[in-house]
UniProtKB/Swiss-Prot annotation:
It catalyses: (2Z,4E)-2-hydroxyhexa-2,4-dienedioate = (3E)-2-oxohex-3-enedioate. SUPFAM superfamilies: Tautomerase/MIF. NCBIfam families: PRK02220.1, taut. Catalyzes the ketonization of 2-hydroxymuconate stereoselectively to yield 2-oxo-3-hexenedioate. InterPro entries: 4-OT, 4-OT-like_dom, Tautomerase/MIF_sf. One of its GO terms (molecular function) is isomerase activity. It comes from the Bacteria. This is 2-hydroxymuconate tautomerase. Disulfide bonds: none annotated. Its EC number is 5.3.2.6. Pathway: Aromatic compound metabolism; salicylate degradation.
Amino acid sequence: MPFAQIYMIEGRTEAQKKAVIEKVSQALVEATGAPMANVRVWIQEVPKENWGIAGVSAKELGR
């Protein structure tokens, strides 16, 4: 069973997350030959203050 775990900075819309799930799932089907019913995708949203970029939080960078 292919499983993708995706970490993203919080703030994406439900539609954007749905698109990520659909496209990542399709990519896993194509790459592994696994049936779509066996594919799992987990999106973990990370608060901006908990995401560091070059030593600074994403919140401080205005992301």
